């Protein structure tokens, strides 16, 4: 099993709920699959440039771009190769202002490339990837249900992107309401950890 592990929290491992959950997911997946390999990418620590017109130019034929654009394409190709090689993708992400951190969005923009991870056909877009994904998510409030559910653009967005690219088998692990106090924080993490155990054991 090849695992691609992505972390996006701006907080460190000691304080980030999503980092702790994604690390536990990967640890349990490795324990259940001896010999599994892991490629790790921390998009918060190793920030990617936000996409502009250069990314489109970088994917142009070799003779039509300069050295800097070639470097942009090389970086993007490396991340796409990581994704294509993965049997399982684990993404750890907090909710920032109702959605993904901008650093994770930048990664998505670098790997969602027509002709590489999806293609346009006469009947619409078709994903070129496969495999399974686990989303280890955290939020200060509760967004999976209740009055703030319409504002949840974290799991819904990531699931939509992955499905668009062909990864339709997506499991979500949530630690919600972690800002509501120590008791809720502990309960949210316990619930998320129990779900991780159940998912990996299934």
Residue ranges, per PLM feature:
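Structural beta-sheet core signal
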Residues: 5, 91, 133-137, 172
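Glycine-rich phosphate/pyrophosphate-binding loop and the adjoining helix
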Residues: 145-202
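Short, structured loop/turn "capping" segments at alpha-beta junctions
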Residues: 114-118, 168-169
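Short, well-ordered alpha-helix to beta-strand connector turns
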Residues: 86-87, 130, 167
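N-terminal beta1-alpha1-beta2 submodule of the flavodoxin-like/Rossmannoid cofactor-binding fold
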Residues: 1-93, 100-109, 113, 194-202
């Amino acid at each position: 099993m090849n695992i691609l592990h992505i972390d996006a929290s701006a907080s460190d491992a000691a304080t980030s709920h999503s980092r702790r959950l994604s690390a536990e997911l990967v640890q349990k997946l490795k324990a259940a699959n001896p010999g599994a390999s892991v490629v790790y990418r921390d998009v918060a620590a190793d920030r990617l440039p936000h996409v502009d017109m250069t990314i489109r130019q970088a994917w142009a034929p070799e003779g039509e771009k300069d050295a800097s654009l070639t470097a942009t394409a090389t970086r993007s190709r490396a991340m796409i190769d990581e994704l294509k090689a993965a049997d399982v993708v684990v993404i750890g992400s907090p909710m920032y202002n109702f959605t993904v951190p901008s650093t994770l969005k930048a990664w998505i923009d670098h790997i969602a490339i027509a002709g590489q991870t999806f293609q346009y056909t006469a009947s619409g877009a078709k994903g070129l990837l496969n495999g399974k994904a686990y989303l280890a998510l955290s939020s200060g409030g509760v967004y999976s249900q209740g009055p703030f559910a319409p504002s949840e653009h974290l799991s819904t967005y990531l699931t939509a992107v992955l499905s668009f690219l062909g990864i339709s088998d997506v499991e979500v692990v949530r630690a919600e309401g972690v800002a509501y106090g120590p008791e809720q924080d502990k309960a949210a993490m316990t619930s998320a950890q129990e779900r991780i155990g159940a998912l990996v054991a299934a």
